[in-house]
Structures are given as structure tokens and as C-alpha cells.
Amino acid sequence: MSEEDKSKKLEELLKLLKVHDGDLSKFTSQQRKDMNEYKFWKTQPVTKFDEVIKKEGPIDSSKRPEDIPDTPLPLLGDFEWCTVDVNDEKQLEDVYVLLNENYVEDKDSTFRFNYSRDFLNWGLKPPGWKEEWQVGVRVKETKRLVGFISAIPTNLQVRGNDVRSVEINFLCVHKKLRSKRLAPILIKEVTRRVNKYDIWQALHTGGVVLPSPVSSCRYAHRPLNWSKLYDVEFTALPANATKTQMIAKYTLPKTPISNIKLMEERHVDEAFELFNKYQQRFELRPNFDKEEFRHWILTREDVVYSYIIENDEGKVTDFVSFYSLPFTIINNPLYKDLGIGYMFYYASDADFGYDRFSAEGTERLRKRLNLLINDACILARNLKMDVFNALTSQDNALFLEDLKFGPGDGFLNFYLFNYRCFPITGGIKEDQTFDVEKRSNVGVVLL
């Protein structure tokens, strides 16, 4: 089967997954058969597409750290394993170059993620991070980094159950080596290293369908600088509309509407308490301690921005955060980059004291989130971001349409490694539109 045919099948399966709202039993036998192409994942402790889940929990709990080999799998003769010391500027630079030249880009190769060194320091080194979980493959002769994968520690709550795990991210193989099947070997090696620490579960996300998503969310985009987005062909001019009309449609006030202000260290205790209480509603969520919350949320210039709203008594009632991950624009004479803001974590006390899905509680939260996220969009625009991205996770469905977020073409699938879990709502209906009624039970956000 050609790569093009495989891509088409993946696209078909992705659409089917959305239509069936994560109910994998609705796949036809032929569609399930197509999953046999995933030779690697068939050998891993993951939920199969045709598996009937009767009980949530670990799939394989028989192993112990002493059962795990002390040495990695052998590589082809031209390559060697390495542990990437991201505290070393030269080695961090190797990761930076590999990601920025070979990581995810759009199908037309027009846009590519541009991870800054500061962003990588933030994303790769949360509290408890381990150097040996930053795994690389180098060319023996030149020492050039051609493969990378990262694991960082995280404690998850999955429907009230504590799951000690890692987040897997930044899996990247040099474009010219994609046929060498380095990706499965990188996954096996980081799994081996994590298992030696007696950790057996992992959370990862991706745009392609693998066995077997626990949830799927849709991307949504809110233009902040429509004119630039049009110029770089990130967006198109709708039929029966003019550029002037589109610019006017997406124009935001010059300054925030509320008394929102930058979160400071002195706000952390209250914001952390608010965050924990708000996150209780979600079925898949992080269980941060205060140091982790501080690391992920406090503002770092050009990386992550966080803001709070206080009531008249000075109590923190809301906070919102977003991170900056620009695109490099390839072969464009006008612009070299596109500023992108990504919705991160937020919390509000607007519906505390109400049932989450009650009419009154829902309306109170909808109004508050519309104010909070609209101000976040204004702040992002003032930071020279050109578009604001959000998933349909958390309670985002309550504000996406109101604030002129348009549904994107992309979907993000959430996977739990070595853990069975009933499907979790992702904030989209069967027709793939925003599900304002059920919303999402995914509270965790991965970079």
C-alpha cells in the first residue's frame, strides 16, 4: 500500500471516529481489519479497536522494574543511542534544529512549528523531569541528532483514579530517515527507561488514529489578524464577502474589557486552589502539585502567559493562560512567521454551587468564559499573535462559537498507554460540530 493510500485510509478512519463519537464498536469489520497495518501497536499494551471494555485500569500489571532490560534495543550500524542533556546549550540546540527542520508541518509544507529554546526549556523540564527520559538517536560518524522523544512525569486523574504516568511528546525523526522505522524504536526505548522507574502508564496525543483513542477533540481557530492570515494563505476569503468585511468581523477592542491582570507569584496559592476545584469536573485531568502548577502557569515571556481576575474583595475568581508557539512560514515573500496563541489552562468560580450541566450554572459559566477568553484574545493580539487556537476540550464549547472561533480541519486524539478507559467526551457532536450541551470531559492539555 502506498503512503498516499495509507494517508487516505487514516483520514477515513479519523472521520469515522468523529462520526461515532469515540464508540469504536461501530467500526465495520473491514475498518477494523485496516488496523492490522499498525504492526507496532498490535504488540503494545493498548486498547484494540474491537475490544469491549468491561473494567478500567492497567492492561498489563505483571512486570516489575527488575524485569526490564538494562540496555536498549540495538540500532542499525550507522546510528547510536544518546541521552540528550537539555541543560547543555549545544545539545538543546540539537533538539531545536531537529524539531524546527523536521517536526509537524501542514500537508502543503507551507507552515512548520517553530519551537523556541525557551519553549523547549519550559516543556522538557517540569518539576521531577529526568535527563535520561530525553532520548535521542545520533549518526555515529557525525554525531548529528536525527531522532528524539521526550517523557516528562505527570500524575493523572482518570475518573477519580490516580494514575502515575508520563506524558510523551516531541517524537521526531529526520525526514530522510522516515523509512528506517526509528519511531517505534524510540517509543520502545523511552518506555524501557520510564519502566525502570516503576512507571507503566503514559499519555500521548496525535492527529492520526491509532489503537485506540480515549477521546478526540477538534481544533478551532480565532483570527486575531485576519489580513495577515489571508496574505499567507492560512485562511481564505469566503464567498460573498470582502476583505474589509472580514477584517471588521474579527476586529477586537484595543484593551481588555474586564479588570484582568497578569498573574504574579502572590496569586499562585489562590489560583492553584481555584484550578483544583474547577478541574474536578473533568474525567481526564492533571493532578498538579503547587510546584508543577507554578512551573506550567506562571508567565514566561514569549512562552506562556497567565492572567487573573479578582473580585471587589481581592479574591481570585478567574484565571486564564495561553502559550505561544509560532509557525515558520516557508517561502513567503511578505512574512517569515505567524504568531500563534494556544488556549492552555483556565478556571472560574462562576458555576460553583451549581450542577455543572444545570441551565443556570451553564449560563453563568458561559457568560464568564466569554468575557475571560475574549480578554485573552485581546491580550494575545496585543502580544502580536495572529491567531488564537483552542480545542473542544475543557468547557471550551461554551465560548467557541460566541467568540468567532471557526472549526478547523484538525483533530487531536488522546491515548492512554497500558490503561483501559471508557470513551471520554471530546466536545464534538456526531456531525463534528461543537457540543455545547455535553461539552468535554477532557481537562488535560498537552503541548
Swiss-Prot record:
The active site is at 447 (proton acceptor). Tetradecanoyl-CoA binds at residues 38-41, 171-173, 179-183. InterPro entries: Acyl_CoA_acyltransferase, NMT, NMT_C, NMT_CS, NMT_N. Its EC number is 2.3.1.97. It is an enzyme of class 2 (transferase). It catalyses: N-terminal glycyl-[protein] + tetradecanoyl-CoA = N-tetradecanoylglycyl-[protein] + CoA + H(+). Pfam families: NMT (PF01233), NMT_C (PF02799). Signal peptide: none annotated. Its main location: cytoplasm. GO terms for cellular component: cytoplasm. It is found in: Cytoplasm. It comes from the Eukaryota. Gene3D superfamilies: 3.40.630.30. Monomer. Adds a myristoyl group to the N-terminal glycine residue of certain cellular proteins. Belongs to the NMT family. This is Glycylpeptide N-tetradecanoyltransferase. The lineage of its organism: Eukaryota, Fungi, Dikarya, Ascomycota, Saccharomycotina. The gene is NMT1.
